[in-house]
Structures are given as C-alpha cells and as structure tokens.
C-alpha cells in the first residue's frame, strides 16, 4: 500500500480560505498602524528639531531659527512648504532669514511621503528662539501659541497631528480629535 504524500484539494482550499479571511481583517489595521506611525515620526522630527533650536539658542546665547527650506541653504517664505524640509540656523539678528554671518546648523530632508503637508494656523514661515529660549516673531494670537498641523491626503482625523509653540518657547504635540487641534 502506498502512503499518501502532499495535500488534498480540500485541505489546500481550507488553508487559502483562512488566509484570505485573516488578510481581510489584518491588512486594513496594518495600514492604519503604518500611517499613524509615519505621521507620528514626521511630527516628532519637527518637534525635536524645534526643541534642538531652542536649547541651541540658550546654549549659544543668540537667536536660532527653524524655517522651511527646499535647498538646505535658504528659507522659503511660505507656511505651506514645511514638508519639503527645513533648516536650523544661528540667526544673529533674529529676522528669520539666513544672512551673511549666519550659520546653518542642521538640514532636515523632505518627507518620504509626498501626500503629507504641514500647515501653520497663523501662516508662520519661521520659528525663532531668542537666547532666553522664548519664541519671537510669532504672530499674535488670542491663545498665546501658534499651531503647526500635519495633514495627510486624504485628510483623516486619525492621522492629523499638531505642534503648538507658545511665546515662552514651550512646545507640545497633540493628536487631532475632529481633524483640527484645539
């Protein structure tokens, strides 16, 4: 008598059906996790660079600015281009522009995802910290802070994150509940 080797068609179809059911349940939640982690990493990148600029300003005793940049050398005067990368530079006169004598301290490359955008609530195109660590040159607002929001396309409250910069230099991050931060 011969012993059977291999799988029957019924066994094979059972395994394929179970794998299909698991994929149907698992893939959407995996997509959520990967998008959420990507957005969190992008927000953390800007958050920690703002913290670095603040601590560098205090350590160096002179203003340090973070601004969007596409070439790694100059600031782009647009509040809607942060996703293209940014630079941190010593800003001796605190005007938010790279002048002669200012030193670029760090360059951050553009996001890997072309669908994510950082937008500022008050059109902030640069954040400057003075030697005391206070944020200067921010537009005045009734709340006392400026919000920079990361949106994905299509916009989803689940993947929207915000960084709030107060005039005293305090930074906080927030997960948007209804698509925008408070």
Question: Model regions: which residues?
Answer:
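Short, contiguous hydrophobic alpha-helices characteristic of membrane insertion segments
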Residues: 6-27
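N-terminal helix-rich module
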Residues: 13, 25-55, 59, 63-182
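N-terminal leader/signal peptides at the extreme start of proteins
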Residues: 1-9, 172
């Amino acid at each position: 008598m011969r012993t059977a080797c291999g799988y029957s068609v019924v066994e094979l179809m059972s395994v394929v059906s179970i794998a299909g059911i698991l994929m149907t349940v698992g893939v959407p939640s995996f997509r959520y996790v990967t998008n959420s982690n990507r957005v969190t990493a992008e927000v953390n990148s800007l958050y920690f660079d703002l913290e670095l600029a603040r601590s560098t300003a205090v350590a160096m005793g002179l203003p340090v600015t973070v601004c969007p940049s596409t070439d790694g050398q100059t600031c782009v005067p647009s509040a809607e281009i942060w996703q293209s990368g940014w630079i941190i530079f010593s800003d001796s006169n605190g005007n938010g522009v790279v002048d002669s004598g200012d030193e670029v301290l760090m360059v951050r490359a553009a996001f890997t995802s072309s669908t994510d955008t950082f937008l500022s609530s008050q059109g902030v195109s640069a954040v400057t910290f003075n030697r005391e660590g206070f944020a200067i040159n921010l537009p005045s607002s009734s709340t006392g802070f400026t919000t920079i929001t990361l949106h994905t396309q299509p916009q989803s409250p689940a993947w929207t994150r915000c960084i709030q910069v107060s005039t005293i230099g305090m930074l906080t991050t927030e997960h948007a509940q209804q698509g925008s931060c408070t």
